[in-house]
Amino acid sequence: MAIITMKSLLEAGVHFGHQVKRLDPRMKRFIFSERNEIHILDLQKTLQGIKDSYELVQRVIKDGKKVLFVGTKKQASEIIEQEARRSDMPYVNNRWLGGMLSNFNTIRKSVQKLKKLEKMEVDGTFDMISKKEISQLNREKSKLAKNLTGIKDMETLPGAIFIIDPKREQIAINEARKLKIPIISVVDTNCNPDVIDCPIPGNDDAIRSVALFTKIISDAILESDKEVGIQIIENLNEEDLMKEIEIKNDKSDSIEEGGNNL
């Protein structure tokens, strides 16, 4: 059973939003306070978003479908790949190609081309063609692999999509909404939560925060066959919470590792 504590969220800097001037007004309901012109997110609502997302993911997996992990920004790319691979799920971590969902059949043709080139490389075909042809095919394979490796084994549309930074991944969101694919996303203070089915209010820039959220989704997938849920431990009262926020703010943890103060 996954155990999430308020303290673990604080330690990851989940509660730090962007500068006050960058607020999307639709995020106001998720704001707890502000410190030094930085918005502080309401971790009670973050915990609820985690719980809702965890339950949605488990329903999707039990229905025999997959969750597509999406995060192409620098802070998220490696984490997205690691956690998607850990839970044996498809992922996009380099660039979202228009039509990955809405023009899925065409994308599958490109995937089949990639698989064919990979097969040619190992079945001896390359031994029978010129070096120039090999070079051309390798360039084509590398180009395809860069954007399609993570979805090579995604034979059908996913049952849900998990996104880091919905502002950056707007095309993916538009395609998922068009196809009525449920969207789970970490929503920072500069995001629009209304286009997300399961918004998780949180810092989508700091590496530790991104890693924590992505691991939670991966854990939900791995535990879907164990009939276990998620345990939320609210181990800080409001006074302690404010003290922790002040301490973290003083240490400037929000801007560590590509944090959120901009």
From Swiss-Prot:
GO cellular component: cytosolic small ribosomal subunit
Molecular function (Gene Ontology), one example: structural constituent of ribosome
SUPFAM superfamilies recorded: Ribosomal protein S2
GO biological process terms held by the UniProt record: translation
Record's keyword terms, sorted: Ribonucleoprotein, Ribosomal protein
CDD domains: RPS2 (cd01425)
Family annotation (Gene3D superfamilies): Glucose-6-phosphate isomerase like protein, domain 1, Helix hairpin bin
Pfam families found in the cross-reference section: Ribosomal_S2 (PF00318)
InterPro entries linked: Ribosomal_uS2, Ribosomal_uS2_bac/mit/plastid, Ribosomal_uS2_CS, Ribosomal_uS2_flav_dom_sf
UniProt similarity note: Belongs to the universal ribosomal protein uS2 family.
NCBIfam families found in the cross-reference section: rpsB_bact
Database matches in PANTHER family: 30S RIBOSOMAL PROTEIN S2 PROKARYOTIC AND ORGANELLAR, SMALL RIBOSOMAL SUBUNIT PROTEIN US2M
Descriptive protein name: Small ribosomal subunit protein uS2
Species per Swiss-Prot/TrEMBL record: Borreliella burgdorferi (strain ZS7)
Gene label: rpsB
